[in-house]
């Protein structure tokens, strides 16, 4: 959260923006964004995390002979469970982007339904965030997908133009 907020012309509007941002950050903790444990068994999908992590580590060892056998233990103890999870994806950045967007959308939905006192300001900040969004049709396919997901979580997908090539 920034030390100084000068996003809007009035002190009151800037304070509302601050409350929305602070509420969203607190929602990460309150609604469990960081409760994920890599080694906890999946109860919905086939659990392939450990297999994928081992496969990735073996690929790294084949490509780099200088990797020591104890590196896996050091890595596991020095990174968070979330980092460990995203490291198993071939396109880590895309996986992290999709997770962040969907998780932020989940949090926004919870905040809007459980904190009615901030709802008007929250929706206003969401609406304002649409002003500087890029045009989807001007983006490459992967970026267009990400932008579409952002708009969906801001509940603005209905008026979003999707190029036919995507």
Predicted regions and their residues:
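Short, functionally important secondary-structure microenvironments
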Residues: 1-166
């Amino acid at each position: 959260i920034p030390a100084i907020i000068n996003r809007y012309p009035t002190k009151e509007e800037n304070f509302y923006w601050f409350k929305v941002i602070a509420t969203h950050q607190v929602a990460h903790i309150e609604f469990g964004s960081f409760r994920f444990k890599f080694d906890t068994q999946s109860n919905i999908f086939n659990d392939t995390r450990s297999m994928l992590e081992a496969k990735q580590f073996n690929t790294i060892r084949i490509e780099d002979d200088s990797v020591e056998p104890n590196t896996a233990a050091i890595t596991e103890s020095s990174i968070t469970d979330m980092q460990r999870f995203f490291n198993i994806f071939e396109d880590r950045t895309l996986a992290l982007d999709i997770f962040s967007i969907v998780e932020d959308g989940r949090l926004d939905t919870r905040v809007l339904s459980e904190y009615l006192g901030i709802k008007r300001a929250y929706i206003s900040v969401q609406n304002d965030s649409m002003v500087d969004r890029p045009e989807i049709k001007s983006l490459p396919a992967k970026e267009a997908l990400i932008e579409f997901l952002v708009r969906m979580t801001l509940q603005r997908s209905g008026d979003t133009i999707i190029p036919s090539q995507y």
